[in-house]
Amino acid sequence: MNRVLYPGTFDPITKGHGDLVERASRLFDHVIIAVAASPKKNPLFPLEQRVALAREVTKHLPNVEVIGFSTLLAHFAKEQGANVFLRGLRAVSDFEYEFQLANMNRQLAPEVESLFLTPSERYSFISSTLVREIAALGGDITKFVHPVVAEALTERFKK
């Protein structure tokens, strides 16, 4: 069974992330969205809420599971029996970091391959950072995130 692990902070999960998950769900038997705690990134949403939002966005995909984690990614992949890391590349600027990450993961978990997918053109410019900035300034984010995520962002920035 091919099990792919799609790691990220997902703060918040965007339509770009969703696009990659949908496509991965057609390519792999089982997709694990691995939501990283990432305390050094100081996420807007707590881990539990990011996991819940990702579950809501992907609930229509029967072979997709969402799990939060706070361990080393290589260890988490082994625990989950994953044999592939899925990473998205929006632009050439993403490549250098992702290349370093793939090489480090290969050293830590040589049995897990790294696979890169590019998002659909209509989502290639979306990032969680931009979505948070637009939401914080009261902009319309409905084109970039699932309605439940837009609602959570709107609620978060009301405070």
UniProtKB/Swiss-Prot annotation:
Binding site for substrate: 9, 41, 73, 87
GO molecular function, one term: ATP binding
Catalytic activity: (R)-4'-phosphopantetheine + ATP + H(+) = 3'-dephospho-CoA + diphosphate
Domain of life: Bacteria
EC number: 2.7.7.3
Gene Ontology CC entries for this record: cytoplasm
Description of how the protein assembles with itself and partners: Homohexamer.
Cited function: Reversibly transfers an adenylyl group from ATP to 4'-phosphopantetheine, yielding dephospho-CoA (dPCoA) and pyrophosphate.
Protein name (database record): Phosphopantetheine adenylyltransferase
Organism: Pseudomonas putida (strain W619)
